[in-house]
Amino acid sequence: MLRYALIFFIIAIIAAVLGFGGIAAGAAEIAKILFYIFVVIFLVTLVLGVARR
């Protein structure tokens, strides 16, 4: 589960770089939203993974 959160976090980072860099100006807002959603998912999964140990 932590692996999937990390994969989605990396995808969100790539989308954010493309969106914030002006390459896809129309998609910048979507990239921002996805970035924050996946940061939250990553942190929740990280906490759950540490709590299970």
Curated annotation (Swiss-Prot):
Keywords: Cell membrane, Membrane, Transmembrane, Transmembrane helix. Pfam families: DUF1328 (PF07043). GO terms for cellular component: plasma membrane. InterPro entries: DUF1328. The chain crosses the membrane at residues 5-25, 30-50. It is a multi-pass membrane protein. It is found in: Cell membrane. Belongs to the UPF0391 family. This is UPF0391 membrane protein BURPS668_A3117. It comes from Burkholderia pseudomallei (strain 668).
